[in-house]
């Protein structure tokens, strides 16, 4: 046999081997490979671009909190408190505690248990990529899911946030787990998947309540809309339909997450309705009017909110989203093509998430702070870390 003939034969055997591997594997190879690429990219960026962390001091808070959790502590009790006061920690009679919920810190603590805090970053990036593929596959098909995962890897916001110790990537991972489990529960009718959805959204609420609410709002709307028939059946013949069972499972586990969050508040702040960030800065939160944190104060008017959020969204679509400036037109073309084929309810829910994230963030003054000086696009944390409050987009 000639050398060319042997090369052709070897290529044929390789192709046949790949086909057999695809047939034998219950998981498609493309999303698995993309998840591994995401993990490698996150770790590489974390040790090359951010070896000493980013300019966002919140990273230190989450790493300190992770170290505390590994030691079984919710409070720090230094011998001389005035000489040891970590960034964004609240002073209380029980000791010092961070202004953030412990969910993100727990994720990073798992990385330390595996060998290093940084090991959590590639794990979150891989899980986020795989879950996004799963969500889009449920709503569209395998090919579109792969395209979505590739688009995620082409997003500077995803790459940067996956390489730093901040809460946005881990919370999005939980939100995507909720979406995937919810879609899978509706397709299969299995209550177990509905329970997973509830647990995931409950954890997301514990991590970042407002972020979870904005993401879950379209799903809640769908859940309520589809309950009319099952509730009527329950009133008429006392039968509990599968849809109602799934809704109860999701709501129950989700409310458990809310209860855990409120219980944590009660332990650290003394009031279940006062979150740690409110104890640290009562005017640092949702709403219009006077907003304040540390020595920085602004009158967050609706007009200022709209201007700031318009600038943030523009930064997302022009610089930080998938494929940069061409990403938004491609997304519009995709939406138009989907509309021509008639929207499935899953697709409508995902479109609703984009709307709820954009509109809901207007009510949060953090999108003003991330910009720094409005007239200077190179100012503020958005210049180096992106519009991270819109990470779910």
Q: Which residues make up each language-model segment?
A:
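Hydrophobic, aromatic-rich transmembrane alpha-helices
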Residues: 128, 315-361
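Short helix- or helix-capping micro-motifs
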Residues: 148-153, 176, 180, 197, ...
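Membrane-lumen/periplasm interface segments of multi-pass, membrane-embedded glycan/lipid transferases
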Residues: 266, 271-337, 370-376
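Membrane-interface transmembrane helices that cradle and orient dolichyl/undecaprenyl
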Residues: 137-142, 178-193, 204, 229
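Perimembrane helix-loop-helix junctions
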Residues: 16, 185-191, 214-258, 262-263, ...
């Amino acid at each position: 046999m000639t050398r060319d003939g042997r090369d052709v034969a070897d290529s044929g055997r390789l192709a046949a081997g790949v086909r057999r591997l695809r047939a034998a594997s219950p998981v498609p190879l493309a999303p698995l490979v993309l998840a591994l690429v995401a993990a490698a990219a996150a770790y590489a960026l974390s040790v090359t671009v951010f070896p000493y962390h980013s300019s966002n001091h919140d990273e230190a808070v989450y790493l300190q909190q992770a170290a505390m959790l590994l030691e079984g502590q919710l409070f720090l009790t230094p011998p001389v408190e005035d000489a040891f006061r970590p960034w964004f920690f609240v002073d209380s009679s029980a000791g010092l505690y961070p202004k953030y919920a412990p969910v993100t810190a727990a994720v990073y603590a798992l990385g330390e248990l595996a060998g290093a805090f940084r090991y959590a970053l590639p794990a979150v990036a891989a899980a986020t990529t795989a879950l996004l593929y799963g969500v889009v596959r449920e709503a569209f098909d395998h090919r579109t899911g792969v395209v979505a995962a590739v688009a995620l890897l082409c997003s500077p916001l995803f790459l940067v946030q996956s390489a730093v110790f901040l809460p946005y990537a881990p919370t999005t991972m939980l939100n995507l787990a909720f979406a995937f489990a919810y879609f899978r529960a509706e397709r299969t009718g299995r209550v177990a998947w509905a329970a997973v959805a509830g647990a995931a959204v409950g954890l997301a609420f514990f991590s970042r309540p407002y972020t979870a609410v904005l993401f879950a709002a379209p799903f809640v709307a769908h859940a309520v809309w589809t309950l009319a028939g099952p509730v009527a059946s329950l009133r008429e013949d006392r039968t509990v339909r599968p849809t109602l069972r799934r809704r109860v499972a999701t709501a129950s586990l989700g409310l458990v997450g809310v209860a855990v969050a409120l219980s944590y508040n009660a332990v650290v702040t003394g009031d279940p309705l006062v979150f740690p960030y409110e104890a640290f800065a009562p005017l640092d939160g949702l709403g219009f009017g006077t907003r304040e944190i540390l020595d920085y104060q602004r009158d967050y008017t609706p007009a200022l909110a709209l201007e700031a959020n318009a600038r943030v969204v523009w930064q997302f679509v022009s610089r930080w989203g998938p494929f940069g400036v061409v990403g938004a037109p491609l997304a519009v073309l995709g939406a138009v093509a989907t509309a021509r084929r008639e929207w499935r309810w899953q697709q409508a829910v995902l479109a609703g998430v984009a709307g709820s994230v954009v509109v809901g963030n207007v009510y949060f003054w953090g999108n003003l702070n991330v910009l720094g000086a409005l007239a200077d696009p190179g100012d503020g944390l958005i210049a180096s870390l992106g519009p991270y409050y819109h990470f779910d987009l």
